[in-house]
UniProtKB/Swiss-Prot annotation:
The lineage of its organism: Bacteria, Bacillati, Bacillota, Bacilli, Bacillales. Belongs to the aconitase/IPM isomerase family. LeuC type 1 subfamily. Pathway: Amino-acid biosynthesis; L-leucine biosynthesis; L-leucine from 3-methyl-2-oxobutanoate: step 2/4. SUPFAM superfamilies: Aconitase iron-sulfur domain. [4Fe-4S] cluster binds at C337, C397, C400. InterPro entries: 3-IsopropMal_deHydase_lsu, Acnase/IPM_dHydase_lsu_aba_1/3, Acoase/IPM_deHydtase_lsu_aba, Aconitase_4Fe-4S_BS, Aconitase_4Fe-4S_dom, IPM_dehydratase_rel_enz, IPMI_cat. This is 3-isopropylmalate dehydratase large subunit. The gene is leuC. One of its GO terms (molecular function) is metal ion binding. Catalyzes the isomerization between 2-isopropylmalate and 3-isopropylmalate, via the formation of 2-isopropylmaleate. It holds the Pfam family Aconitase. Its cofactor is [4Fe-4S] cluster. Heterodimer of LeuC and LeuD. Its EC number is 4.2.1.33.
Length: 464
């Protein structure tokens, strides 16, 4: 029987196996940020240990930094965490993309754009959405703080091998429908626990047609379906994306051959298989308090509901059977590790060019990294957004989570391109609706959700 992509990635990294069936995996890349690393570094300090492979470790500041005035950090805890990361990286000789550095940005944005993320690697980070890097054919997953310490000290991690789920995506995406809508559709249909104990492998003609940034969006939210990770076999688009980046391999031809071996064999069998035709897919909007509580923009909110739905309706201030078009939007956030890359900003800019944000709506665009920000400004996207009435910010996690100054006031609704809509995720009492960049941009113009498929934009932008 053939091997799945998961099998090939896993077997290449097993150092040892214990009596409980756990495998000790070698870790090729460890990404670090300011929130989940302080206790891990302190653990090394208390036991007089060093970081075993600082050359395979890379740190950045993203969660706590303000995006409006990055040099004016007023929150005491946030400043302490940022200062602590800076001190730890200096003491343990870990490379750091500090505030103001040209390489700084959201950890899951800078990894790929710097060429740190590569096919065949095992990648970990003390962050749930490490699955993003699986878009490159890497086995990437989030870990806890004690595991962060273990990897810092040993460059290994004990893990139990997950099962493999194959998700085949067939057909061509309609105009106005994106990778974000695919994953929201999957979550609404199969729930937030379907992937528990699995690694999701996305494949099929739809995947082949996607660019790398769309694939990253898809893998980013595999964790929202309960999966350990999301992966996509590398192809010519993967190779072209990685080639020439700062930390990309120099022996390109030899490494390219190794990457070409990373795929699921034709005679391999998944532990669970799902097939979805995307041809008739529509833009999605979440209405509740987990990412599976979503509907097509042309559907009404569910009439039948259970106790969890009842709580969600109450928290969100919505009613069963309500039209998605009637959901008010007071805030719009375009950013996060899900949708803050250049192509995301281009799509949003193409929607708002020459138009104005609805009076009373606060709209933010937060690029995922300094490099994304610079590239967007080179193309004039910042002017398009600012002329429309958006705030153009510095890179950071921003409004994705309520642990920095960018928050949604209690009881107000936000159209967000982020990945989680839990209670209080964007601030106490904040009401989060997950959507694609195109849908978020359109909501900013109207002050409520609209069907982007009916708007006059072509998904591409003219910079004239």
């Amino acid at each position: 029987m053939g091997k799945r992509l998961l099998d090939k990635l896993w077997e290449r990294h097993v150092v040892a196996t214990n009596e409980n069936g756990l495998d000790l995996l070698y870790i090729d890349l460890h990404l670090v940020h300011e929130v989940t690393s302080p206790q891990a570094f302190e653990g090394l300090r208390l036991t007089n240990r060093r970081v075993r492979r600082p050359d395979l470790t890379f740190a950045t500041m993203d969660h706590n930094i303000p995006t409006k005035d990055v040099w004016n950090i007023t929150d005491r805890i946030a400043k302490q965490q940022l200062d602590t990361l800076r001190e730890n990286c200096k003491q343990f000789q870990v490379p750091l993309a500090d505030i103001g550095d040209e390489e700084q940005g959201i950890v899951h944005v800078i990894g790929p754009e710097l060429g740190l993320t590569q096919p065949g690697k095992t990648i970990v980070c003390g962050d749930s959405h490490t699955a993003t890097h699986g878009a490159f054919g890497a086995l990437a997953f989030g870990i806890g703080t004690s595991e962060v310490e273990h990897v810092l000290a040993t460059q290994t991690l004990w893990q139990r091998k997950p099962k493999a789920m194959g998700i085949e995506l067939k057909g061509k995406l309609p105009q106005g429908v994106y990778a974000k809508d695919i994953i929201l559709h999957l979550l609404s249909k199969y729930g937030v626990a379907v992937g528990t104990g699995y690694v999701m492998e996305f494949y099929g003609e739809t995947i082949h047609a996607m660019d790398m940034e769309e694939r990253m969006t898809l893998c980013n939210m595999a964790i929202e379906g309960g999966a350990k990770a999301g992966i996509i076999a590398p192809d010519e688009k993967t190779v072209a994306y990685v080639k020439g980046r700062k930390y990309a391999p120099k022996d390109y031809e030899s490494i390219k051959k190794k990457w070409s071996e990373l795929y699921t064999d034709l005679d391999a069998v998944y532990d669970l298989h799902i097939s979805v035709d995307v041809t008739d897919l529509a833009p999605y909007v979440t209405w509740g308090t987990n990412p599976s509580m979503g509907v097509r923009i042309d559907e009404k909110l569910p009439e039948k509901y259970d106790a969890n739905d009842e709580r969600a309706f109450s928290y969100m201030g919505l009613s069963p059977g309500q039209s998605t078009y009637d959901i008010p939007v007071q805030h719009v956030f375009i950013g996060s590790c899900t949708n803050s890359r250049l192509s995301d900003l281009e799509i949003a800019a193409s929607v708002v060019k020459g138009k104005k944000v609805k009076e009373g709506v606060r709209a933010l665009v937060v690029p995922g990294s300094q490099r994304v920000r610079e590239a967007a400004m080179h193309k004039g996207l910042h002017r398009i957004f600012e002329e429309a009435g958006f705030e153009w910010r510095e890179p950071g996690c921003s409004m994705c989570l309520g642990m920095n100054p960018d928050q949604v006031p209690e009881g107000e609704h936000c159209a967000s391109t982020s990945n989680r809509n839990f209670e209080g995720r964007q601030g106490k009492g904040a009401r989060t609706h997950l959507v694609s960049p195109a849908m978020a941009a359109a909501a900013a113009l109207y002050g409520h959700f609209v069907d982007i498929r009916k708007e006059s934009y072509d998904g591409a932008i003219s910079y004239s």
